[in-house]
């Protein structure tokens, strides 16, 4: 009888562990983890970031809505303890290797125009976003603010199992990014409300200098994105100085009801030499629309 009870207890623990793994929920965090929420030492996410030791420390956020505009200058991992964590605000990234998981970024009833902003003040390498969402921002869900005056580089962005919905200008707008991987994500109704003189897109990449490398989009849906601008599309990529080459890969993606599906190049400039590799793209109306007309 005792052996039977022991075996039953062991089986229960195995089943609980298996269910935790299958649900994708991490229940065991390092001892160094900082917890945020009502009744915890840190009641705001920013206070936990400020207290972190900048060595990839976990910041675990309890269920709830947090109205904050974060500034992240340390390497931290910000993880929702459940799928019920909403950030009504934004996060500005000025550190390498920042990680977000199970955070719902919301632009509703806030002053922030963008969900995540890559700081233009320094080069940033490594941003990982897993199982998050970006909805309802007046500009972009995720944006890099590099420009010709401050052409700081952003490299190694990885986004998985994340949705971008109804962001006014774009789901993602990246200036001067080189390495970019999107996998098992969805983009819907981004760029629909952009002014006609602005480019409404699900994803917009604009490289200021250098070459694209490892730009890949896998198993991702693009539905009803874009506006009436001639360069509007589900996916748009260009290069200001027109002095590069590179390859962009789409693998097992769905395109449905977008203003245009894929656009490369820039108007009024020669061909930009971007190679678009499309593998099993469902609904794609044409491989690529090239904006390479040398108009004067």
Predicted regions and their residues:
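Bacterial N-terminal signal peptides that target proteins for export
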Residues: 1-11
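Bacterial N-terminal signal peptides
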Residues: 9-21
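Sec-dependent signal peptide cleavage junction
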Residues: 19-31
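Acidic Gly/Asp/Thr-rich repetitive segments characteristic of extracellular carbohydrate-active
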Residues: 31-65
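Right-handed parallel beta-helix/beta-spiral solenoid domain characteristic of secreted/periplasmic
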Residues: 38-40, 67-69, 76-118, 128-136
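Acidic glycine-/aspartate-rich tracts in secreted/extracellular proteins
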Residues: 56, 64-65, 82-84, 227
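All-beta strand scaffolds that present successive hydrophobic residues in beta-strands
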Residues: 77-80, 98-102, 124-130, 154-159, ...
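Extracellular beta-strand/beta-solenoid scaffold signature
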Residues: 86-92, 107-121, 136-154, 165-175, ...
């Amino acid at each position: 009888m005792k052996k039977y009870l022991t075996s039953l207890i062991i089986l229960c623990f195995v089943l609980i562990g298996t269910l935790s793994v299958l649900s994708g929920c991490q229940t065991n965090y390092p001892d160094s983890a900082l917890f945020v929420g009502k009744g915890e030492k840190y009641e705001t996410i920013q206070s936990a970031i400020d207290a972190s030791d900048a060595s990839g420390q976990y910041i675990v956020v309890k269920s709830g809505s947090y109205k904050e505009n974060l500034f992240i200058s340390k390497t931290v991992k910000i993880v929702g303890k459940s799928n019920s964590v909403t950030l009504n605000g934004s996060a500005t990234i000025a550190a390498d290797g920042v990680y977000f998981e199970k955070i719902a970024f919301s632009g509703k009833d806030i002053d922030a125009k963008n969900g995540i902003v890559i700081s233009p003040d320094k080069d940033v390498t490594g941003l990982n976003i897993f199982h998050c969402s970006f909805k309802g921002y007046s500009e972009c869900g995720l944006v890099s603010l590099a420009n010709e005056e401050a052409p700081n580089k952003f490299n190694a962005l990885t986004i998985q199992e994340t949705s971008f919905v109804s962001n006014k200008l774009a789901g993602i707008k990246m200036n001067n990014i080189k390495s970019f991987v999107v996998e098992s994500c969805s983009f819907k109704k981004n760029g629909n409300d952009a002014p006609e003189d602005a480019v409404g897109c699900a994803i917009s990449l604009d490289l200021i200098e250098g070459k694209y490398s490892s730009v890949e989009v896998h198993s991702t849906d693009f539905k009803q994105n874009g506006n009436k601008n001639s360069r509007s599309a589900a996916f748009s990529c260009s290069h200001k100085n027109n002095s590069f080459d590179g390859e962009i890969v789409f693998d097992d993606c769905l395109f449905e009801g977008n203003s245009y599906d894929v656009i490369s190049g820039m108007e009024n400039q020669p061909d930009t030499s971007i190679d678009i590799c499309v593998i099993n793209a469902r609904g794609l109306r044409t491989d690529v629309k090239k904006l390479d007309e040398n108009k004067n």
